[in-house]
Amino acid sequence: MRLFKKRNTISERHVKANKRAEDLVPSGLMKRCPNCGLEFFARRLDKYKTCPDCDYGFRLTARERLAWLCEESEEWFKDIQPSDPLHFPNYEAKVAAGKKKTGLNEAVWTGLAKIGGQETALAIMDPFFIMGSLGQMTGEKLTRLIEAATEKRLPVVVFTASGGARMQEGIYSLMQMAKVVNAINRHKAAGLLYLVVLTDPTTGGVTASFASEGDITLAEAHAMVAFAGRRVIEQTIHEQLPKDAQRAETVLKHGFIDRIVLRQEEKETLAWLLKYGGMQDD
């Protein structure tokens, strides 16, 4: 019967977009949530930059996070610059681009801060500086911060956001994993508090070292928390991973983190932990 005959249809991939009309749409007008896929006007994002539907936290620069997290802050070790021990091709250009994007000299902001009135040593990794990668001087800044906190008997709060060890620095980058963890162990041995907040993404050598050492470990909603990348794992085991396998919610179920906290609640939560963690005077 003609009623049931196949009809000719035009597939979506054969429909040509009106390039002229596309050019009339201002750049940055719309945002798309990488977690739930919601498309919305960029003006709906406030200072926290979270998806209005699923609370996924869009990536922030260290200074953007610092602006709403702390009422006071003082940057330490800001003059430390990345090294280029291997003279890696185009590395200097990547460093220059990272500095321009973030206003930092390295992939982590370090300093003294007050969060909800509680004084703490603070480190915030910046995913816009060579993907927040852990380089030789990133590790140096973190180590110096933790050692200073131990000497001054301060707690330490670290926000992680990293693609892992910085490949352009080879073994010098990998050595920072042990170096920072050793500083953390000395800090803990002194009876001081070490808090970690995992943000999107926390992967590779950072996950395998100081991101996993928190006395209390928090994570932002839907943050990617992993060691190896999805494609690497799937090509190794020849199986597809579940969609949420490397998300904070799955990691929480398996006991790796203690709590998922919404970005709007981070300041209050950290202030409470710092106050009642036994490391602060009233």
From Swiss-Prot:
It comes from the Bacteria. It is found in: Cytoplasm. InterPro entries: AcCoA_carboxyl_beta, Acetyl_CoA_COase_Trfase_b_su, ClpP/crotonase-like_dom_sf, COA_CT_N. GO terms for biological process: fatty acid biosynthetic process; malonyl-CoA biosynthetic process. Its main location: cytoplasm. It catalyses: N(6)-carboxybiotinyl-L-lysyl-[protein] + acetyl-CoA = N(6)-biotinyl-L-lysyl-[protein] + malonyl-CoA. It is an enzyme of class 2 (transferase). Its cofactor is Zn(2+). Its EC number is 2.1.3.15. Binds 1 zinc ion per subunit. A zinc finger (C4-type) spans 33-54. One of its GO terms (molecular function) is zinc ion binding. GO terms for cellular component: acetyl-CoA carboxylase complex. Residues 29-282 form the CoA carboxyltransferase N-terminal domain. The keyword Zinc-finger applies. Pathway: Lipid metabolism; malonyl-CoA biosynthesis; malonyl-CoA from acetyl-CoA: step 1/1. Keywords: ATP-binding, Cytoplasm, Fatty acid biosynthesis, Fatty acid metabolism, Lipid biosynthesis, Lipid metabolism, Metal-binding, Nucleotide-binding, Transferase, Zinc, Zinc-finger. Component of the acetyl coenzyme A carboxylase (ACC) complex. Biotin carboxylase (BC) catalyzes the carboxylation of biotin on its carrier protein (BCCP) and then the CO(2) group is transferred by the transcarboxylase to acetyl-CoA to form malonyl-CoA. PANTHER family: ACETYL-COENZYME A CARBOXYLASE CARBOXYL TRANSFERASE SUBUNIT BETA, CHLOROPLASTIC (PTHR42995:SF5). Belongs to the AccD/PCCB family. HAMAP family: AcetylCoA_CT_beta. Acetyl-CoA carboxylase is a heterohexamer composed of biotin carboxyl carrier protein (AccB), biotin carboxylase (AccC) and two subunits each of ACCase subunit alpha (AccA) and ACCase subunit beta (AccD). This is Acetyl-coenzyme A carboxylase carboxyl transferase subunit beta. It comes from Lactobacillus delbrueckii subsp. bulgaricus (strain ATCC 11842 / DSM 20081 / BCRC 10696 / JCM 1002 / NBRC 13953 / NCIMB 11778 / NCTC 12712 / WDCM 00102 / Lb 14). The lineage of its organism: Bacteria, Bacillati, Bacillota, Bacilli, Lactobacillales. The gene is accD.
